[in-house]
Each structure stands twice: as structure tokens, then as C-alpha cells.
């Protein structure tokens, strides 16, 4: 294990909403260092979300992220020659990272014309408690529930 914690790189808030969470999302959305392109995709997606739902796209996106944020996950631990899946609470920072990664991943896997279309559809689905990213969260929680018997083991 490493001796010291790595330094956290300070994030600049995004230009439109002045939110660091948006910057984190855009950094995960970005391909090949093209950050301005990622911002364009993200803002287009929020505009499309606003058009679809009739609500503020930014608020719908925040709600969607909240809906796919996991509370518990399973971690592998080897005990006496057997590997157990032990349920553990997810750290706050990791919760956010996982929800962002899942939303971006399952948006890319969707069918659609452009990435902004796919992202908009995934945001709308997640805000309603549907979609692949929400299903991933549910599966993670279900896995933790199924392995509740091993919760007394330390990780």
C-alpha cells in the first residue's frame, strides 16, 4: 500500500454553471484531451434534456446523478483459501466517481445519432429511475444484499 495520499488536483468550476461537479463529469466524458468538445456535448445534452422534460436540464442531471449513486458495494476478500464478496459502504468521493463513470459508460453504449443525444436520453432515463446506469446501481445494491451474511468480515 502507498504511504501517503496522492495530492488532489484542484478543479476549476465550469464556465456556465460554475460547478466543479460538472467539470468532473466533463473530464470523464472527454476523449483524447478534447475538453472543449466534451463541454459542447454536455451542454447540448442538457439543452435536449430541458426540451424533453420541460424542466431545467441542469437540475434533471443532478437528480439523475443522485438516482444512480450507489450506497453500498461488494469488495473481494480472500479468507482461508476462499474469496468472499463482502458488502461495504462506499466512500463519498467514490460514490460520485462511480455514478459519473456509469452514466458516461452507459450513455456511450446506447443507440443514438450523437453522443449528446445518447447522454440526454440516459440522463432522462436515470432521473426517472430507469436506464442502464440505474440498473447497474440496483445490481450493485442487490449483490451487497445477497452477501449480507459476510458483512461481519473486515475489509
Task: Pin down the residues of each PLM region.
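Strongly charged
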Residues: 1-32, 36-39, 43-155
